[in-house]
Amino acid sequence: MARYLGPKLKLSRREGTDLFLKSGVRAIDTKCKIDNAPGVHGARRGRLSEYGVQLREKQKVRRMYGVLEKQFRNYYAEAARLKGNTGENLLQLLEGRLDNVVYRMGFGATRAEARQLVSHKAILVNGKVVNVPSFKVAANDVVSIREKAKQQTRIKAALEVAEQREKPTWIEVDAGKMEGTFKRMPERSDLSADINEQLIVELYSK
């Protein structure tokens, strides 16, 4: 399945919530009718079946983290094999992706921009270049900007935007050095309450 390259606001409207696909700190619903689905008849968001609600939640989380359908299924399968709560395991696996960690540290204004930085070899993990967005970041790994990429305007702009966002407690960042430490995996209470991962578990358990 190809990665979606169309308007980002349309995806957020489709899911009825801000997916944080656009840069900036202004809430997305101040820019568009987030409660209305896209299209001419968007205002008529119909009632969904139980399956439809579960599917929408899966699509929302998948799009939020910028993961393709096959990748998402693989993450779910891995989460189900791990001990503990499958839904929480799934969110932790997604949070541990390098592109997401780069975004959380504020080096990218969006997850898509963070993914580009990784793919373009602008990111170091423990001093070594890693250009795989899905790379699993472990506790105490140090993620930093490669020296020759530190002058990129978009990275500096992203760090300015990140200053206005709530800072994750599981990450420590030195903006001056453009370096951060992934201290631990986030707990469920650290993450968005707007995600209902149990719906995704129910969907894949059918």
Swiss-Prot record:
GO BP: any one term: ribosomal small subunit biogenesis
UniProt KW Cell wall biogenesis/degradation keyword: no
Keyword presence, RNA-binding: yes
Gene3D superfamilies from the UniProt entry: Ribosomal Protein S4 Delta 41, Chain A, domain 1, RNA-binding S4 domain
Domain S4 RNA-binding, residue spans: 96-158
Pfam family name, one: S4
InterPro entries per record: Ribosomal_uS4, Ribosomal_uS4_bac-type, Ribosomal_uS4_CS, Ribosomal_uS4_N, S4_RNA-bd, S4_RNA-bd_sf
SMART domains to which the protein is assigned, alphabetical: Ribosomal_S4 (SM01390), S4 (SM00363)
GO cellular component: small ribosomal subunit
Source organism superkingdom: Bacteria
HAMAP family: Ribosomal_uS4_B
PANTHER family the UniProt entry points to: 30S 40S RIBOSOMAL PROTEIN, SMALL RIBOSOMAL SUBUNIT PROTEIN US4M
Family: Belongs to the universal ribosomal protein uS4 family.
Primary role: One of the primary rRNA binding proteins, it binds directly to 16S rRNA where it nucleates assembly of the body of the 30S subunit. With S5 and S12 plays an important role in translational accuracy.
UniProt protein name: Small ribosomal subunit protein uS4
